[in-house]
């Protein structure tokens, strides 16, 4: 699991 990618996706979704 790529946490950096997932974290980026979550950040983008919360934007």
UniProtKB/Swiss-Prot annotation:
Q: Tell me yes or no: is Transit peptide among this UniProt entry's keywords.
A: no
Give any GO molecular function from the UniProt entry. toxin activity
Can you name a GO cellular component term?
Answer: extracellular region
Tissue specificity annotation = Expressed by the venom gland.
BP-aspect Gene Ontology terms: defense response to bacterium; defense response to fungus; innate immune response; killing of cells of another organism
Q: Note the superkingdom of the native organism.
A: Eukaryota
Q: What UniProt keywords apply to this chain's record, in alphabetical order? A: Amidation, Antibiotic, Antimicrobial, Fungicide, G-protein coupled receptor impairing toxin, Immunity, Innate immunity, Mast cell degranulation, Secreted, Toxin
Q: Which residues carry this modification: Serine amide?
A: 15
Record has Secreted as a keyword = yes
Q: Where in the cell is it found?
A: Secreted
Q: Which family does it belong to?
A: Belongs to the MCD family. Mastoparan subfamily.
Q: What does this protein do?
A: Antimicrobial peptide with high activity on Gram-positive (S.mutans, and S.aureus), and Gram-negative bacteria (S.enterica), as well as on fungi (C.albicans, C.glabrata, and C.neoformans). Shows a potent hemolysis on human erythrocytes. Together with phospholipase A1, stimulates prostaglandin E2 release from murine peritoneal cells and macrophages. Its mast cell degranulation activity may be related to the activation of G-protein coupled receptors in mast cells as well as interaction with other proteins located in cell endosomal membranes in the mast cells.
Task: Kindly provide the name given to this protein in its UniProt entry.
Answer: Mastoparan-V2
Taxonomic lineage from the root = Eukaryota, Metazoa, Ecdysozoa, Arthropoda, Hexapoda
